[in-house]
Amino acid sequence: MVKNTDDVSVSTPAKEGIMQGNGAWCVVGFPPCKDNKCYCCIGGRTHARYSTMAECRHACF
């Protein structure tokens, strides 16, 4: 049985990011960047951490 994670209440830090048409996101405040000091590429061609949004967008999209 697959559990629907939408029903789970989880406290997450505020996230900000930019999404591209391919579904990739660069976000801050998302693990492993919980301290809001780096940007993470989610759903893109990399899953690395970057120090700036510009670096993340260039690598991720």
From Swiss-Prot:
Q: Does this UniProt record's set of keywords contain Disulfide bond?
A: yes
| Keywords (A to Z) from UniProt | Disulfide bond
Q: Where are the transmembrane segments?
A: none
- Signal sequence residues: none
**UniProt xrefs under Pfam families:** Meg
Disulfides per UniProt: 38-60
Q: Disulfide bond: present as a keyword of the record? A: yes
Q: Which domain of life is it from?
A: Eukaryota
Tissue-level expression reads: Ubiquitous.
Q: Which InterPro entries match?
A: Meg
* Family assignment from sequence similarity: Belongs to the MEG family.
Q: What is this protein called?
A: Protein MATERNALLY EXPRESSED GENE 6
Give the source species. Answer: Zea mays
